[in-house]
Curated annotation (Swiss-Prot):
It holds the Pfam family Lactamase_B_2. NCBIfam families: PRK00685.1 (NF001911). This is UPF0173 metal-dependent hydrolase Tneu_1348. The keyword Hydrolase applies. It comes from Pyrobaculum neutrophilum (strain DSM 2338 / JCM 9278 / NBRC 100436 / V24Sta) (Thermoproteus neutrophilus). InterPro entries: Metallo-B-lactamas (IPR001279), RibonucZ/Hydroxyglut_hydro (IPR036866), UPF0173 (IPR022877), UPF0173_UPF0282_UlaG_hydrolase (IPR050114). Keywords: Hydrolase. Belongs to the UPF0173 family. The keyword Hydrolase applies. GO terms for molecular function: hydrolase activity. It comes from the Archaea. HAMAP family: UPF0173.
Amino acid sequence: MQIRWFGHSAFMVEVQGLKLLIDPWISNPLSPTSPQEVANMRPTHILITHDHFDHMGDAVDISKAAGAPIVGTYELTLEVAEKGIPEAQTVPMNIGGTIKLGDGVEVYMTPALHTANRGAPSGFVIATPQGTVYHAGDTGLFRDMELIAELYDIDVAMLPIGSVFTMGPREAAIATQFLRPRRVVPMHYNTFPLIRQDPEDFKARVEAVSRAKVYIMKPGDVLKL
């Protein structure tokens, strides 16, 4: 398994022959690449946590270019269908549901404490034979993160730390305690001035309360498990 960060909340998880693109705002100011270049990587699926511009991002254009189905809440899949994605190229699901993708890969949709234009905000757990990844989407801290940890043994958690619209470093460190991942990657920070944060502050807070290893990635970096 390998996880590539494109800045903000955009990641690609490559595992079991799949390329799962999450929240692809590839045209974000920190991104080292373009939406067309990401489409050329041939993602097999596009997972969207909610429909705010910085998460829906370039999903429709990439889906059209690569032929990749879009996975999201039922309401979100209706929204992308209105933007020209064929219904057959959407995979609707909802919070608490699980879908199977490929060989031994399951995607579980988690709740998130946030807002959305249509439908509900969410996160994703991607459980595979090579490890389990949790992408929290945009969220505040919530105690039921402990339930996610009961259901899944998380190898990597991607958590927002930008504050203002999501958790900040303090809350995300507590989330790390709740989730008990082996590794944690901060996301959703420093993309624009309102969410400017020092990831080293988050790292220090995590190390004070958890055994999780913090990986501060740069846009374009790849984390291999």
